[in-house]
From Swiss-Prot:
Stored SUPFAM superfamilies: Aminoacid dehydrogenase-like, N-terminal domain, NAD(P)-binding Rossmann-fold domains
Family from the record: Belongs to the tetrahydrofolate dehydrogenase/cyclohydrolase family.
Record organism: Lactiplantibacillus plantarum (strain ATCC BAA-793 / NCIMB 8826 / WCFS1)
Catalytic activity, EC: 1.5.1.5, 3.5.4.9
Primary role: Catalyzes the oxidation of 5,10-methylenetetrahydrofolate to 5,10-methenyltetrahydrofolate and then the hydrolysis of 5,10-methenyltetrahydrofolate to 10-formyltetrahydrofolate.
GO cellular component: cytosol
Coiled coil: none
Pfam family, one: THF_DHG_CYH
Binding site for NADP(+): G166, R167, S168, S191
UniProt protein name: Bifunctional protein FolD
Catalytic activity of the protein: (6R)-5,10-methylene-5,6,7,8-tetrahydrofolate + NADP(+) = (6R)-5,10-methenyltetrahydrofolate + NADPH; (6R)-5,10-methenyltetrahydrofolate + H2O = (6R)-10-formyltetrahydrofolate + H(+)
Molecular function terms from GO: methenyltetrahydrofolate cyclohydrolase activity; methylenetetrahydrofolate dehydrogenase (NADP+) activity
């Protein structure tokens, strides 16, 4: 029988821990602060940013949303980031994707102070993750949230075969690094992988992050595998679905995340957790 991983329930636990940490910092006169910069009026981004802001405020954090027009130049955006880098009340900076064509996204990522890189995308922090560098640094929130879910459900990656389908810098690559650091044997699969579904069937832990609705069906899943569906897609009827065909996976997967209600809540909860950690770490380093 397939057990459903309740991302909302795990996120609730993380948020409770974060609220406690915020209160502890408040007793020291520190309020964790996050600045989210959004360029343009992408509808999905607006909803996501609104959810982030609401959650941060609810947890007692200082939250700033900087809305910029789609015509914003790269230099203007860089100047705003520089100001937040220098602002001691801001501990985490996030520039929401997608960005307009006139803005070089890698350059923007590089401009954020690595100590305020709440998304964990700065090459300095990515390098630390890849090398399993000791110490405190931010890690991409969706993969980190997935690792938290696995731990909460008693899934230890050590010695297991893990397959990550998708090689983005947001999910796929950092996910593979975290699983490797946790002693799993990891394969990264993608659109150019020969016989992708045969590779998927080898996985004890299968993470699917492609943006292709129902790419993976029950026939592609190893019996008893843990399946993490990162997809947020729309089917032909406009219904929100994942990269995994949830219905056909029933009775085959041992554990599976639903869409919605699986990975999504964990991403925002982990973002808040990371912001508070950045505030703690900055206080120690000052």
């Amino acid at each position: 029988m397939t057990k459903i991983i309740d991302g909302k329930a795990v996120a609730k636990k993380v948020n409770a821990q974060t609220a406690t940490a915020v209160a502890e910092l408040a007793a020291q006169g520190i309020q964790p602060g996050i600045a989210v910069i959004i360029v343009g009026d992408d509808a999905a981004s607006q909803i996501y940013v609104r959810n982030k802001n609401r959650k941060a405020t609810k947890l007692g954090m200082h939250s700033v949303v900087r809305q910029l027009p789609a015509t914003t130049s790269q230099d203007e955006l860089l100047a705003i980031i520089a100001a937040y880098n220098a602002d001691d009340s801001i501990h985490g900076i996030l520039v929401q994707s997608p960005l307009p064509a006139q803005i070089n996204e890698p350059l923007i990522t590089m401009a954020i102070d690595p100590k305020k890189d709440v998304d964990g995308f700065h090459p300095t922090n990515v390098g630390k993750l890849i090398t399993n560098f000791p110490g405190n640094y931010p890690v991409a929130n969706t993969p980190r949230g997935i690792m938290t879910m696995l731990a909460d459900y008693g899934v230890d990656p050590a010695g297991k075969t893990a397959v990550v389908i998708g090689r983005s810098t947001i999910v796929g690559k950092p996910m593979a690094a975290l699983l490797t650091n946790a002693n799993a044997t990891v394969t990264i699969a993608h659109s150019k992988t020969a016989d992708l579904k045969a590779v998927a069937r080898t996985a004890d832990i299968l993470v699917v992050a492609t943006g292709i609705a129902h790419l993976i069906t029950g026939a592609d899943i190893k019996p008893g595998a843990t399946v993490i569906d990162v997809g947020m897609d729309r089917d032909e009827n406009g219904k929100l679905v994942g990269d995994v065909d949830f219905d056909s996976a029933q009775g085959i997967a041992g554990l599976i995340t639903p869409v919605p209600g699986g990975v999504g809540p964990m991403t925002i909860a982990t973002l808040m957790q990371t912001t508070v950690e950045l505030a703690k770490w900055s206080d120690v380093s000052e």
